Amino acid sequence: MAIQLSNQRYEEIKCIVVRMFVAYGVSCVPINGFEIAHKMGVKVMPYSAYSSNIRWLLIKKSEDGFSIEKTNGQWYIFYNDEKDYGRVNHTIMHEIGHIVLDHSEDSELAEKEVKFFAKYALAPPVLIHKLKLDNPES
């Protein structure tokens, strides 16, 4: 059976996204995951920065990207820069979601939460409605 988030949890995540936008001065679209990560002090590393042997291991861990926290508390997001910009930006925001939502382990619940976090952060329904956007090209 698929995990379902409660309405309360959806609302909590929406509030977390809004607080993040306020904290990091996000006030225009398109939402840039790289900029938010930079403002958070997260180091963002493309797979292409590594040798082919290491890159193979990174892709084996995740086709799109992943985040890790070093013992000193520094967060890193590694991402596959061979993907298109939209996919990369979504991956960065997805990983920011894991960091902001304080996910300490992979789980179906954590993935459900972070998928909603990234979707809401990159395309907030209120903003889409206010700007009268009705298709992806808008």
Question: Regions from the language model: what does each represent?
Answer:
Residues 1-138:
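Active-site hotspot residues in diverse enzymes, especially metal/ion-binding acidic/histidine motifs
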